[in-house]
């Protein structure tokens, strides 16, 4: 039966008239569908004419619902004549809660359609979010009315019980529907006021439940089933993080990690001045990435330190790693425990508190018997006990725990074949490390007071640490305890005091002051050699030594012009020095007779040595006279010998090979022992042997640095014993050097010390792009997942040599090349693609943390700026091999810049509480250049591959990358996700709509606090919903 549309009334009126006629004539659903289409033009939704509103209004006019109208409503939904959003919105407006039969009918209707709710147009998306929130609010209102009725009558009518049952079923369906939960999450951000009203309604229900004691169960009503209040709580307190998202690796935590030991080796050896709070932030970040508990993190840190100590025996870094493992690590654990509010308990025996996580960490460490057995045997002591005693000092554990844990270890250690405790180098080093804390405290206390009052005691303490490797030990302990800056400041102050003569000095005071000047100068020079001059210049002062080290000291990676040093000399001082040299009794006596200031002599020595060298070249001075002059310099002050050697080494770097022999002979003479009457007079000085020994070490280091340069005369090699050439740059091709380094790592499964320095040299010589390409090549050689994960961990740690530049090289050069170029790079296929995606994400997150901290992670002096300039200028990664360390780099696309934004603080790096995540993390995290530009380029490359409808391994790599980025970074990574091109996720969704693509993942990819983020998220989850429903309909 076709209806005549001759009347020119509005279509809304026509639809209402048609409803009345359909009811009178009892049309079937099909008849209704045929006739209604005569009014609705093709492609026009009934929502435009409020069709759903008209049908529901007629359906609930009486005391009971009209099922015929509800059948028309369902048919209109199935025929897509009206939207689910319009239906839910109209049902939520029904407020006649006393009509129980109508409520039951509407709830039954909802039960039948709720699982199929979706959107089929852009206009519906915005309506559905508010409609869903309104529907939940409506369900809560119904339940609240029933509770109020129960509070008044202490019982429920049968119809009210049916209403409660229907509400429970609908709520359960919503809770179990990921799409509706996603829509609710968007609606919560879209209309906060409505969601606040929802929360208030729930609070009222909770209070009524407590008052009345009425609890309605969902489902069968057994003891384990959910209650209606539980379902409401899940909806009202809904968070995006609660939505289901399939874990990247199945949520498993790796049983063994290979990243911490290389990371410790790199940071301790190449960045010894790193503060404790930087280690804390770095370790918490690693914990998040790996999913470790704090107990596991603490255990892996201690285990990594013990493995790193395995091959330090006899090396220059032995004291540094020992001090880090047994002094620094306890302080790191203490700060980690304090900053993260670690769990604490009271010891029953003593009443003292202790850290539960630290105790669990030691219990885990005791399970790693091979490492402990080997270190106990090598150290001839119980290394666990040494660590435990330090933990007790910091109140992380109690003496009771020490006894218990040592007792567990004792049966194993008793049967070990230990080295002789008096001859084991590591044993002696451990004893010295623990003993040096007290002398260091005494030195710092003396340096902080007036030097004129304690100069005798201060000189004795400083000279005491010059014997053997005591100075290295003191410096190592000072660096790991965070006292290095105080130590340097005190030495600078002491040196400035000692260089100034006072008229009131009598007796031995002038001699002590001169020795104090000499010792403090050389200790500072030794520090500048070992840790870089930047640690001295960081004080920002204008003292004598700071000026000397900045303008006169020869340094690795900081070339200084020898002729500029010569020109800065004062001619009057130079003239007087020449007169002292020509003194008939020798240079030593001449210097004693002069009234020159010591600092002026240091500034003028380069000019004096230059004139002497030129005279020797022209044969106008005999070698014997030169020997007497040099002996006089070093006999008077070892400082003068260091100044002379510094200029000579700088000079040798600038001249031809045939002009290097005479300057090197002069340097050798400075290192040689004194003889004759001059030696007897020299021995009368205070602590002359200790001062001379330190001077020899400093000068020999200068020689070794000169030998690293490619322009060294081959004849000079014969002047040095073989042990002095251990740091000479290898002449093997770079490929072979890298293969040797990787072989050493692969054989052990950890990073040896010498390999750490070799990889750092390769990074500086070849650039990050070359090194990262070689490392990734080793990753793709692996066949098994276990080997892949192990290799990825080691590569991730090695990239911390310079994490920012290596990350930029990986993301801007290597990954795009692998996506775009099929011939020259390995194919991105699973499982390699999965591990590569994990490496990329780890590097992005760590680089964000590193680049936004206030303090630089690595101190490389002016070499850093030189590297950045080269990176910006070069156009090819294939640069000529340059032997000067730090001057040959590969090209990256990164342009350095300082984007403004809030910087990461230590607190932002700590594990936040659940409430802190949503409010603080997103506002703190910002991206800076060059990482931001690099990611934008990478995402554009991703978009090129997802433009087609073909699911390829490379497209799946993009999905793995985004999935792990969301899982590992959470809200902190939102600034990265904002760079995703519009439509990228939707294009990926159309190709890869598998079970791995969930509503939870999609919502985490967008910032729901912005209108555009909510719009794109809603569009994507609706698309996913429709794809899933189409698949289900095909199965049917």
UniProtKB/Swiss-Prot annotation:
> Sorted alphabetically, which InterPro entries does this protein's record hold?
Mediator_Med24 (IPR021429)
Biological role: Component of the Mediator complex, a coactivator involved in the regulated transcription of nearly all RNA polymerase II-dependent genes. Mediator functions as a bridge to convey information from gene-specific regulatory proteins to the basal RNA polymerase II transcription machinery. Mediator is recruited to promoters by direct interactions with regulatory proteins and serves as a scaffold for the assembly of a functional preinitiation complex with RNA polymerase II and the general transcription factors.
Task: List the protein's name.
Answer: Mediator of RNA polymerase II transcription subunit 24
Domain of life of the source: Eukaryota
Q: Which family does it belong to?
A: Belongs to the Mediator complex subunit 24 family.
The yes or no answer to whether the keyword Nucleotide-binding is present is yes
Per the record, what is one GO cellular component? mediator complex
Instruction: Return one Gene Ontology term, BP aspect.
Output: positive regulation of transcription initiation by RNA polymerase II
- The answer to whether the entry has keyword Lipid biosynthesis is no
Q: Which GO terms describe its molecular function?
A: nucleotide binding; transcription coregulator activity
Alphabetized PANTHER family for the sequence: MEDIATOR OF RNA POLYMERASE II TRANSCRIPTION SUBUNIT 24 (PTHR12898:SF1)
Relate the assembly described in the record.
Answer: Component of the Mediator complex.
Keywords for this protein: Activator, Nucleotide-binding, Nucleus, Repeat, Transcription, Transcription regulation
Indicate the principal place this protein occupies in or around the cell.
nucleus
Subcellular location, record wording? Nucleus
């Amino acid at each position: 039966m076709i209806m005549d549309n001759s009347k020119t009334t509005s279509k809304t009126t026509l639809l209402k008239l048609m409803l009345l006629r359909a009811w009178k004539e009892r049309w079937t659903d099909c008849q209704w569908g045929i006739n209604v289409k005569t009014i609705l033009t093709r492609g026009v939704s009934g929502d435009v004419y409020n069709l759903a509103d008209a049908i529901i209004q007629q359906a609930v006019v009486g005391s009971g619902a009209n099922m015929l109208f509800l059948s028309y409503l369902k048919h209109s939904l199935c025929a897509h004549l009206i939207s689910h959003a319009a239906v839910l919105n109209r049902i939520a407006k029904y407020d006649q809660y006393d009509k129980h039969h109508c409520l039951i009918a509407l709830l039954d209707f909802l039960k039948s359609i709720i699982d199929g709710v979706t959107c089929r147009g852009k206009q519906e998306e915005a309506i559905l979010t508010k409609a869903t929130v309104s529907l939940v609010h409506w369900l809560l209102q119904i339940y609240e009315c029933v509770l109020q009725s129960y509070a008044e009558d202490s019982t429920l009518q049968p119809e009210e019980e049916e209403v409660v049952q229907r509400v429970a079923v609908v709520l359960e369906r919503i809770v179990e529907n990921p799409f509706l939960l996603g829509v609710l999450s968007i609606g919560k951000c879209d209309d906060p006021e409505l969601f606040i009203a929802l929360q208030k309604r729930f609070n009222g229900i909770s209070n009524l439940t407590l008052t009345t004691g009425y609890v309605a169960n969902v489902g069968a009503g057994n003891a384990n089933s959910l209650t209606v209040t539980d379902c409401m709580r899940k909806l009202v307190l809904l968070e995006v993080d609660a939505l289901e998202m399939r874990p990247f690796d199945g949520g498993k935590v790796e049983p063994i990690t290979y990243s911490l030991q290389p990371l410790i080796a790199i940071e301790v050896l190449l960045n010894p001045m790193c503060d404790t709070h930087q280690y804390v932030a770095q370790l918490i970040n690693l914990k998040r990435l790996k999913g470790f508990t704090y107990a596991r993190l603490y255990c892996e840190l201690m285990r990594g330190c013990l493995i790193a100590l395995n091959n330090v025996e006899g090396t220059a870094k032995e004291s540094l790693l020992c001090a880090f493992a047994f002094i620094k690590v306890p302080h790191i654990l203490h700060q980690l425990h304090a900053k993260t509010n670690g769990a604490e308990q009271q010891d029953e025996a003593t009443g003292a508190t202790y850290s539960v996580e630290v105790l669990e960490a030691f219990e885990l460490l005791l399970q790693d018997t091979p490492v402990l057995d080997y270190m106990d045997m090598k150290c001839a002591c119980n290394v666990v006990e040494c660590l435990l005693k330090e933990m007790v000092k910091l109140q992380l554990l109690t003496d009771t725990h020490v006894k218990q844990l040592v007792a567990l270890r004792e049966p194993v250690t008793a049967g070990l074949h230990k080295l002789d405790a008096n001859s084991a180098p590591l044993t002696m080093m451990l004893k010295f490390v623990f003993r040096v804390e007290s002398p260091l405290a005494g030195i710092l206390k003396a340096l902080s007071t007036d030097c004129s009052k304690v100069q005798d005691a201060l000189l004795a303490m400083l000279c005491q640490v010059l014997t053997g490797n005591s100075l290295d030990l003191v410096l190592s302990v000072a660096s790991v305890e965070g006292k290095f800056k105080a130590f340097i400041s005190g030495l600078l102050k002491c040196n400035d005091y000692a260089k100034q003569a006072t008229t009131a000095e009598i007796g031995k005071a002038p001699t002590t002051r001169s020795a104090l000047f000499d010792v403090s100068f050389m200790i500072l020079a030794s520090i500048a050699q070992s840790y870089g001059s930047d640690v001295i210049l960081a004080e920002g002062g204008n003292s004598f030594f700071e000026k000397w080290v900045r303008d006169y000291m020869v340094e690795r990676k900081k070339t200084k012009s020898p002729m500029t040093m010569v020109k800065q000399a004062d001619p009057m001082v130079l003239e007087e020095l020449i007169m002292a040299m020509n003194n008939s009794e020798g240079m030593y006596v001449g210097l004693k007779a002069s009234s020159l200031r010591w600092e002026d002599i240091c500034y003028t020595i380069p000019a004096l040595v230059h004139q002497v060298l030129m005279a020797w070249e022209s044969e106008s001075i005999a070698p014997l006279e030169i020997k007497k002059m040099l002996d006089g310099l070093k006999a008077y002050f070892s400082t003068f010998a260091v100044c002379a050697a510094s200029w000579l080494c700088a000079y040798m770097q600038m001249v031809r090979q045939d002009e290097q022999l005479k300057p090197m002979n002069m340097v050798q003479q400075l290192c040689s022992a004194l003889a004759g009457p001059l030696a007897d007079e020299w021995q009368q000085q205070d602590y002359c042997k200790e001062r001379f020994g330190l001077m020899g070490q400093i000068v020999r280091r200068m020689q070794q640095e000169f030998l690293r340069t490619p322009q060294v005369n081959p004849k000079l090699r014969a002047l040095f014993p073989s042990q002095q050439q251990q740091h000479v740059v290898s002449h093997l091709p770079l490929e072979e050097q890298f293969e040797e380094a990787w072989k050493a790592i692969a054989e052990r499964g950890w990073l040896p010390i010498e390999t750490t320095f070799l990889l750092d040299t390769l990074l500086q010589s070849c650039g990050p792009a070359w090194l990262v390409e070689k490392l990734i090549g080793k990753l793709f050689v692996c066949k098994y997942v276990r080997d892949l994960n192990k290799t990825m961990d080691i590569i991730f740690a090695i990239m911390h040599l310079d994490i920012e530049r290596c990350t930029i090289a990986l993301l801007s050069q290597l990954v795009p090349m692998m996506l775009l170029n099929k011939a020259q790079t390995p194919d991105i296929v699973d499982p390699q693609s999965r591990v590569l995606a994990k490496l990329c994400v780890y590097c992005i997150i760590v680089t964000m943390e590193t680049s936004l901290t206030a303090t630089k992670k690595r101190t490389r002096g002016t070499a850093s700026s030189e590297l950045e300039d080269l990176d910006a200028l070069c156009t090819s990664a294939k640069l000529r091999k340059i032997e000067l360390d730090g001057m040959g780099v590969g090209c990256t696309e990164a342009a350095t810049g300082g984007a403004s934004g809030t910087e990461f603080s230590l607190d932002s790096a700590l594990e936040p509480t659940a409430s802190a995540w949503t409010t603080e993390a997103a506002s703190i995290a910002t991206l800076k250049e060059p990482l931001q530009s690099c990611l934008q380029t990478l995402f554009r490359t991703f978009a090129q591959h997802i433009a087609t409808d073909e699911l390829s391994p490379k497209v799946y790599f993009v999905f793995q990358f985004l999935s792990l980025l969301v899982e590992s970074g959470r809200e902190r990574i939102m600034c990265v996700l904002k760079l995703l091109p519009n439509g990228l996720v939707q294009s990926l969704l159309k190709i890869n709509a598998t079970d791995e693509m969930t509503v939870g993942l999609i919502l985490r990819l967008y910032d729901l606090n912005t209108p555009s983020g909510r719009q794109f998220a809603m569009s994507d989850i609706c698309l996913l919903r429709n794809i899933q429903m189409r698949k289900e309909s095909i199965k049917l």
